[in-house]
Amino acid sequence: MIHRVDRLSENSINPITGNEYDNSWIIFMLTDSLDYRQMSGSNNACAYTIKVSRKQYKNWKMAVGDFIGYCEANKKNAILVMSEENLKSARDHYEGHRYNEPLLRDSEPSVLVHSTPMNSWKQIKSDGMLKSWNMLKTEKAISEEQPIGIWLGDPTDFSDYIMFGGDVTGEIIVNSKQQGKIIMDINTEYLTGARLYFDAERMARDGFLVRDGCHLKVKNMLPLKPYLIWAATWETIGLVSQISTPRIFAEQADKQFQSILQDYNSQ
């Protein structure tokens, strides 16, 4: 069920139930912050919260609509932190859209990036597809007890999805997995894996893309063909060693990908 409140204090007490949050709850908070467009996570024992700034993100109404659609489809308990006026404005603007509509919006990136450790990349190639953490765990293909998203406060059902990002985010995740804790320093050395570039337009058209108000993701599995455009590894981008930093690996891979993308788009 989806609830709306005008304001919310980020602490462990759920304003709807009066009790502590359990993992079934998720929050969408509309702000006027100048410090970010979108951000997500859990602070001060509060439920997982997606924050979207009206001042910095012009597509905030679409984000609200996607969040509502995602929560309704997955029967999640959700809290919208915004005025009734802003909620009505978002609903009116979103009319005719769906959180999983099979098209890529003008505001969405044409390429989605997923980063993975090298040993996982070998398994992905063997399987011919990406799989969610929960699917891999069910198949006993991984030994880790919990996904890294748990450290970030992710809801448990997020492990049903393959997450995508851009910039250096994926490399931060790979490095953090290796270190067993969240490492935000993009200049620390780590063992590079594979940085995978996917055709987002084709993924959307074929019904794979899911939007939750903050992320673009895919549920359960994604075949490599015909969606994978290119896989960057330390060898394919010309590094002298598998050891690098998240910043260098991401920058070098993205730079080389631009020429590959031009060839791909001209086909």
Annotated model-derived regions:
Residues 91-135:
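Short, extreme N-terminal leader segments that mark the start of a protein/domain
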Residues 115-117, 166, 198:
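Hydrophobic side chains in beta-strands
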Residues 56-66, 121-176:
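Glycine-rich loop/turn
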Residues 1-107, 156-160, 169-267:
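Conserved NAD+-utilizing ADP-ribose enzyme module
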